[in-house]
UniProtKB/Swiss-Prot annotation:
The lineage of its organism: Bacteria, Bacillati, Actinomycetota, Actinomycetes, Acidothermales. PANTHER family: ELONGATION FACTOR TU, MITOCHONDRIAL, ELONGATION FACTOR TU-RELATED. Pfam families: GTP_EFTU, GTP_EFTU_D2, GTP_EFTU_D3. The gene is tuf. Coiled coil: none annotated. The keyword Nucleotide-binding applies. NCBIfam families: EF-Tu (TIGR00485), PRK00049.1 (NF000766), PRK12735.1 (NF009372), PRK12736.1 (NF009373), small_GTP (TIGR00231). It comes from Acidothermus cellulolyticus (strain ATCC 43068 / DSM 8971 / 11B). Residues 19-26 are annotated as: G1. GTP binds at residues 19-26, 83-87, 138-141. This is Elongation factor Tu. The keyword Cytoplasm applies. GTP hydrolase that promotes the GTP-dependent binding of aminoacyl-tRNA to the A-site of ribosomes during protein biosynthesis. Residues 10-206 form the tr-type G domain.
Length: 397
């Protein structure tokens, strides 16, 4: 195969390994880097198992998570790949979105088939919106019986179907991460087949800049003679002078206005783009009509809501979370983007209480509306300290 040269023009995709403990997620991650390194050492460093397994701890929204980041390139793409050593780390990562995934490689041991954590990870992938799954049927070298391999594959497809993934269409690739690490040509090829499945099956993600404009408001002030300016970091999309925008959230009524100026570091610009910290001058808006916690966005692209369902991770005592459980009708602050709003928690039927360190589903009613959509992340706070992290899974009202 001809050597792929490193070009920043390759599309970038975020990916990760998920699945039951000891089914070989970390070994597979190491094998991918080794096979690609052997094929093309100039652009692909080899990351050994030990290095991935001893992933450094990161803090995301006050939660400690061990995540290993590796990167590699196929001919078509540049991948950033995350692997978490511990089961709890996976759950925390998926709920807090410390590392976003455009697709996941579900690792299932061919010798054991789907296990409890396999199910839990697939369910979480569904709830936190991991859009595509590719299956690596690992340890396929130790299963001699073709019928058993077919049975396990069928089981995995049924499991994916039961969580609303297209189980019949998902690529299932038989691999042996260990044999590939040892350099066995048959199993080295299996890793390349798996990567081809990722290249072909996981679509290129829509870049933030191509999405509809949205900027959370951090600050509001008045420029005498010019009007009201709101500042913040553009979350997605592009805003240009002359664009019509809406101001959504907190207040009962959504306001429509026009952008009369965009500035960055006190310089006037034609436009602000995703990632920029900017000030936006708004026509005919009074200082008291807007506040921190609202968003400025493309008209009709997002709506205000007060009631939603969420998947939440509750910080353990060691992470600085609560020392005691909470019960139904718990009333903490929900921190969305730039502001706190009080809300009431309704626990699922049959759940008496939630302990620190648990993950749970809940229904929340906020006392003020927030501009939200499915997938929006938030923190749960008490008196300014974070006690949980969650993600909106369904909007109710």
């Amino acid at each position: 195969m001809a050597k792929a040269k490193f070009e920043r023009t390759k599309p970038h995709v975020n990916i990760g390994t998920i699945g039951h403990i000891d089914h070989g997620k970390t070994t597979l991650t190491a094998a991918i880097t080794k096979v690609l390194h052997d094929q093309n050492p100039d652009i692909n460093p080899y990351t050994p198992f030990e290095q991935i397994d001893k992933a450094p701890e990161e803090r995301a929204r006050g939660i400690t998570i061990s995540i290993a980041h590796v990167e590699y390139q196929t001919e078509k793409r540049h991948y950033a790949h995350v692997d978490c050593p511990g089961h709890a780390d996976y759950i925390k990562n998926m709920i807090t979105g410390a590392a976003q995934m455009d697709g996941a490689i579900l690792v299932v041991s061919a010798a054991d088939g789907p296990m409890p954590q396999t199910k839990e990870h697939v369910l979480l992938a569904r709830q936190v919106g991991v859009p595509y799954i590719v299956v690596a049927l690992n340890k396929a070298d130790v299963v001699d019986d073709e019928e058993i391999l077919q049975l396990v594959e069928l089981e995995v497809r049924e499991l994916l179907n039961s969580y609303e993934f297209p189980g019949d269409d998902v690529p299932v690739v038989r691999v042996s991460a260990l044999k590939a690490l040892e350099g066995d040509p048959k199993w080295t090829q299996s890793i390349l087949d798996l990567l081809k499945a990722c290249d072909d099956y996981i679509p290129e993600p829509v870049r933030e800049i191509d999405k509809p404009f949205l900027m959370p408001i951090e600050d509001v002030f008045t420029i005498t003679g010019r009007g009201t300016v709101v500042t913040g970091r553009v979350e997605r999309g592009v805003v240009k002078v002359g664009d019509e925008v809406e101001i959504v959230g907190i207040h009962p009524k959504t306001l429509k206005t026009t952008v009369t100026g965009v500035e960055m570091f006190r310089k006037l610009l034609d436009e602000g783009r995703a990632g920029d910290n900017i000030g936006v001058l708004l026509r005919g808006i009074k200082r008291e009509e807007v506040e921190r916690g609202q968003v400025v966005c493309k008209p009709g692209s997002i709506t205000p809501h007060t009631e939603f369902e969420a998947q939440v991770y509750v910080l353990s005592k060691d992470e600085g979370g609560r020392h005691t459980p909470f019960f139904n009708n718990y009333r903490p602050q929900f921190y969305f983007r730039t502001t706190d709003v009080t809300g009431v928690v309704h626990l699922p039927e049959g759940t008496e209480m939630v302990m620190p360190g648990d993950n749970t589903e809940m229904r929340v009613e906020l006392i003020q509306p927030i501009a939200m959509e499915e997938g929006l992340r938030f923190a749960i706070r008490e008196g300014g300290r974070t006690v949980g992290a969650g993600r909106v899974t369904k909007i109710l009202k």
